[in-house]
A protein has these predicted regions:
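Membrane-interface extramembranous regions
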Residues: 2-144
Length: 144
């Protein structure tokens, strides 16, 4: 038996508590992961990143830094606007942005024959897209 994702209350459809909770859990974990990964790419010496990740050797150092800043901002965007209810429409936009970064990472890894690296950007991109969809369409957060 499947549970419904929403309940009808006097003509209005409200998302279930499970969906809200699931979105918050994904937002928190994904936000923390992108904050850590972004901080690493934005601040660590490129030589350290090459030793750790490998792929930064194949791209300009400036691109590695831009990716790091994008991941930092995206990680913040997944959490802060929704948590503070200040411009909460930025949360689904952060999800879309991070999903795009992960799509580009997937394309990069495929083009470099790094098929073993694909699960991470595919899963993270899917989770970011889930947050974008959930917070834009199914369980938006109302602004203050």
């Amino acid at each position: 038996m499947m549970k419904k994702m929403s309940v009808r209350v006097s003509g209005d459809v409200r998302p279930s508590k499970a969906l809200h909770l699931g979105l918050w859990v994904v937002q928190g974990l994904l936000g923390a992961m992108f904050l850590a990964a972004g901080a690493m790419k934005a601040t660590q010496p490129i030589a350290v990143l090459v030793d750790t990740l490998g792929w930064p050797a194949a791209v300009p150092a400036a691109l590695v830094r831009v990716i790091g800043v994008a991941e930092l901002l995206g990680g913040l965007g997944l959490i802060l606007p929704a948590a503070t209810r200040v411009k909460p429409m930025l949360t689904p936009l952060a999800g879309v942005g991070l999903a795009m970064v992960m799509l580009l990472a997937t394309i990069f890894h495929i083009s470099h024959g790094e098929l073993g690296a694909l699960p991470i950007p595919l899963v993270l991109g899917g989770l970011a897209a889930f947050v974008a969809w959930g917070r834009a369409a199914k369980a938006p957060i109302a602004p203050r």
